[in-house]
């Protein structure tokens, strides 16, 4: 800005403007003319800090009203409401669109969110399911460039690892070399004592962040854990009768977010426990679809996740359940 222009504009500093007039003038220059706070300060003969305070006062008083004309506007409001309602560290709500499979869209959203959380060389723990693998697939370039290490939270992830084939050969990936569920509690106990399983589980409990899928009994035959053959339709119905609304890592939760008691499957799983999962600093749940609202709400209520990536229809349903 020229000295002449500054001199011309600084005449406003000597005017007996009311505070509202001053707020309006500052807001016009900032939002309409696109001037920086420093430029406005020079024009009005005011320090930049004063300009900043006037803008904040304008927003608080209603003189300044910011309108976001975007399909993301409602999603941003939902993110704020979810964050405040559940005390989330991270939340991402995607617009409801039918043009791309939901798992893919959620995976992209989760990958973008994790890029803002993970530091170079940190350890990311990965749960069972298609959506989490979609996330890792879209995060693969970041994982390679930042040398983020991967560890699985449970067994059964091996078949999905084809989704991260783009990872650099130097990347560290530790997998539990076993299925999600085995035939009995005795077999699970034996395998957990094997170093190849025990060491990976131990590493997972020290992860810097985790990403997990959330299954729902409302999905019926579409539930990943059922399609993968780890439970039968009969078991799914029985779990629902006992109060289960969904699962994380194969552990079935009731509406309060507590593990449903007296289920054999809970003793036959290979991986970290829900208590161990809840101790991690950042646990991002990735799930969408109105049929999953009960399960997502349970996970939030039980504080099993402190981050959420979902889509707007699901977010509204979860908030409706929360009242």
Curated annotation (Swiss-Prot):
<dbReference type="InterPro" id="IPR051054">
    <property type="entry name" value="SorC_transcr_regulators"/>
</dbReference>
<keyword id="KW-0238">DNA-binding</keyword>
<keyword id="KW-0804">Transcription</keyword>
<dbReference type="GO" id="GO:0003677">
    <property type="term" value="F:DNA binding"/>
</dbReference>
<feature type="DNA-binding region" description="H-T-H motif">
    <location>
        <begin position="37"/>
        <end position="60"/>
    </location>
</feature>
<dbReference type="InterPro" id="IPR036388">
    <property type="entry name" value="WH-like_DNA-bd_sf"/>
</dbReference>
<dbReference type="GO" id="GO:0005737">
    <property type="term" value="C:cytoplasm"/>
</dbReference>
<dbReference type="GO" id="GO:0030246">
    <property type="term" value="F:carbohydrate binding"/>
</dbReference>
<dbReference type="InterPro" id="IPR037171">
    <property type="entry name" value="NagB/RpiA_transferase-like"/>
</dbReference>
<dbReference type="InterPro" id="IPR007324">
    <property type="entry name" value="Sugar-bd_dom_put"/>
</dbReference>
<keyword id="KW-0678">Repressor</keyword>
<comment type="function">
    <text>Transcriptional regulator that represses the expression of the lsr operon in the absence of the quorum-sensing signaling molecule autoinducer 2 (AI-2). It also represses the expression of the lsrRK operon. Acts by binding to the intergenic region between the lsr operon and lsrR. In the presence of phosphorylated autoinducer-2 (phospho-AI-2), LsrR is inactivated, leading to the transcription of the genes.</text>
</comment>
<dbReference type="Pfam" id="PF04198">
    <property type="entry name" value="Sugar-bind"/>
</dbReference>
<comment type="similarity">
    <text>Belongs to the SorC transcriptional regulatory family.</text>
</comment>
<keyword id="KW-0805">Transcription regulation</keyword>
<keyword id="KW-0963">Cytoplasm</keyword>
<protein>
    <recommendedName>
        <fullName>Transcriptional regulator LsrR</fullName>
    </recommendedName>
</protein>
């Amino acid at each position: 800005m020229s000295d002449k222009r500054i001199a011309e504009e600084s005449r406003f500093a000597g005017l007996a403007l009311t505070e509202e007039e001053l707020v309006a003038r500052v807001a016009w220059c900032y939002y309409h003319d696109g001037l920086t706070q420093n430029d406005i300060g020079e024009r009005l003969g005011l320090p930049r800090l004063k300009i900043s305070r006037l803008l904040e006062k304008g927003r608080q008083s209603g003189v300044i009203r910011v309108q976001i004309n975007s399909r993301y506007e409602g999603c941003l409001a939902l993110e704020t409401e979810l964050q405040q309602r559940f005390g989330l560290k991270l939340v991402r709500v995607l617009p409801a669109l039918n043009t791309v499979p939901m798992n893919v869209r959620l995976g992209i959203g989760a990958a973008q969110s994790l890029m803002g959380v993970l530091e170079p060389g940190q350890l990311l723990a990965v749960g069972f399911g298609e959506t989490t693998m979609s996330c890792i697939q879209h995060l693969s370039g970041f994982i390679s460039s930042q040398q983020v290490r991967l560890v699985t939270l449970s067994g059964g992830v091996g078949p999905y690892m084809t989704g991260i084939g783009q990872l650099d050969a130097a990347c560290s990936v530790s997998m539990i070399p076993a299925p999600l569920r085995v035939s009995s509690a005795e077999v699970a106990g034996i395998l957990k004592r094997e170093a190849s399983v025990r060491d990976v589980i131990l590493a997972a409990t020290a992860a810097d962040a985790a990403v997990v899928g959330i299954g729902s009994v409302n999905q019926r035959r579409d539930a990943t854990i059922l399609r993968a053959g780890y439970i039968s339709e009969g078991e799914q119905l029985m779990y629902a009768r006992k109060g289960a609304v969904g699962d994380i890592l194969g552990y079935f939760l009731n509406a309060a977010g507590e593990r449903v008691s007296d289920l054999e499957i809970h003793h036959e799983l290979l991986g970290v426990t829900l208590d161990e999962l809840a101790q991690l600093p950042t646990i991002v749940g990735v799930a969408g679809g109105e049929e999953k609202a009960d399960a997502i709400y349970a996970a939030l209520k039980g504080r099993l996740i402190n981050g959420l990536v979902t889509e707007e229809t699901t977010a509204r349903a979860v908030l409706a359940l929360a009242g």
